[in-house]
Design a protein with these regions (language model features):
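Bacterial N-terminal signal peptides that target proteins for export
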Residues: 6-16
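Hydrophobic h-region of N-terminal signal peptides that target proteins for export
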Residues: 20-28
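Catalytic loop of the DD-peptidase/beta-lactamase superfamily, centered on the K-T-G motif
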Residues: 27-70, 119, 159-161, 198, ...
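Active-site SXXK
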Residues: 43, 57, 63, 89-114, ...
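A short, well-structured edge-of-sheet supersecondary motif
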Residues: 48-81, 113, 170-180, 237-240, ...
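Secretory-pathway/luminal and periplasmic proteins that interact with or process carbohydrate-rich
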Residues: 66-68, 124-133, 142-153, 223, ...
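Active-site-proximal loop and beta-strand segments within enzyme catalytic domains
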Residues: 73-203, 220, 256-265
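Short, well-structured active-site flanking segments
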Residues: 77, 97, 103-122, 217-245, ...
Length: 390
């Protein structure tokens, strides 16, 4: 089934007390007791103001969750509260899973991210405007291949159509239809007037191509590869691209910005945004990246491989290999799509990270996104208390 998308005793002592009171009264981003009822109330007030059904969040130190909260309802219609087991759509956070899979293959010597991506596919990949220039996996990992986003469904008609859960067309079909000249949905606008490797242009199509490369080289369907080689080894059985793998009782309802519920769906570019997970399980994945590719006794990447993925490629934007390096040494990724607003980040040196998930996307002034989001600001301020040695 297919359907269209709707598109935070001395004068000195008295002065210090005055400062604390002033901050609590006049800066809602800085509640006096972070993690207390004041803290929770500040988050709930922001949720109510923006009509957000639920928010779940956690802070990780080293490999342990040191704080976790669930606010609001996973299902408003029948008043099911959100919990740390509620499964949310992760949206573009999913791209860090693609980066993990690609770097696993590179680590095994099955691909070279600086060679022609066509070497690892059953068809060539060339920008017709620059036919002599190769497109490499690294370019795709840094959104610099020259491929369209697309920004809107008009740019590549039908690319962002919705499908019933787990029923998206095969990746090979999507890519041959949209990417190859002569494909049923091919339009010249799929390639931009930018030579491969020259300009950063965010591309869901490009990261979907990476996912298909993983599928073709490994011989495993992409969602199955991720489940077997990333999620299950990390102790994440309630995490998958496929809804069929998950407990339906734990799935959050997805909502539009107008608070209307929408059916669970998938898209042609599902690798770029369709991982579903809970905050408690996603913490394992974030902890692995925060600790050089290992979560407790499980290693999904060698430390050198993880370091390469986190190496800065574009100082202007902070882009690494699908991860973003931000001011202060924090690496993160956001996600936003109908039914979800998500964000996660970690500080590599201090080994502290945070995750925020919600079951509604807000187009503007989203409170869970940095730098100005109120909910993000509250949680980030609390996370800062865990920086430094354990």
């Amino acid at each position: 089934m297919r359907f269209k998308m709707n598109i935070k005793k001395s004068k000195r002592a008295k002065s210090f007390l005055f400062i604390l009171v002033f901050m609590a009264l006049h800066c809602r981003l800085l509640p006096r007791f972070a993690g207390s009822s004041d803290f929770d109330e500040a988050i709930l007030e922001e949720m109510q103001a923006r009509r957000i059904p639920s928010v779940v969040a956690c802070i990780i130190k080293n490999t342990d969750i040191v704080w976790m909260r669930s606010y609001g309802l996973a299902d408003k219609e029948i008043s099911i509260p959100a919990t740390d087991q509620t499964i949310y759509l992760l949206a573009s956070i999913s791209q860090t899973v693609i980066a993990t899979a690609v770097m696993q293959l590179a680590e095994k010597g099955l691909i070279d991210i600086d060679q022609d991506v066509g070497l690892y596919l059953p068809f060539p990949v060339r920008n017709p405007n620059y036919p002599q220039s190769i497109v490499t996996p690294r370019m795709l990992l840094t959104h610099s291949s020259g491929l369209a986003g697309p920004k809107t469904d008009d740019e590549l008609p039908g690319f962002y159509d919705w499908f019933s859960p787990d029923a998206a067309p095969p990746l090979a079909q999507t890519l041959m239809d949209y990417l190859l000249p002569g494909g049923s949905s091919y339009v010249p606008a799929v390639w931009k007037e930018s030579a491969p490797g020259r300009m950063e242009l965010y591309s869901n199509l490009g990261v979907t191509l990476l996912a298909y490369m993983v599928e073709f080289v490994s011989g495993e369907e992409f969602s199955s590869y991720c489940r077997e080689h990333i999620f299950l080894p990390l102790g994440m059985p309630g995490t998958s691209y496929k809804i069929a793998d998950l407990n339906p009782e734990n799935l959050a309802v997805w909502y539009l910005e107008n608070t209307q519920p929408i059916p669970h769906y998938t898209r042609r570019d599902y690798p770029a945004g369709q991982v579903k997970s809970s905050v408690s399980e996603l913490a394992h994945f974030l902890a692995a990246w925060m600790n050089g590719g290992a979560y407790k006794e499980v290693r999904i990447l060698n430390s050198d491989t993880a370091a390469e993925a986190l190496r800065l490629h574009n100082p202007a934007s902070g882009l690494c290999l699908l991860w973003n390096l931000m001011i202060g040494g924090w690496y993160g990724h956001s996600g936003g799509v109908n039914g979800a607003s998500t964000y996660m980040e970690f500080h590599k040196q201090d080994k502290v990270g945070l995750i925020i998930l919600s079951n509604m996307y807000l187009e503007s002034e989203n409170p869970i996104y940095p730098p100005a989001g109120k909910i993000y600001g509250l949680i980030r301020q609390y996370a800062n208390q865990f920086r430094g040695p354990a």
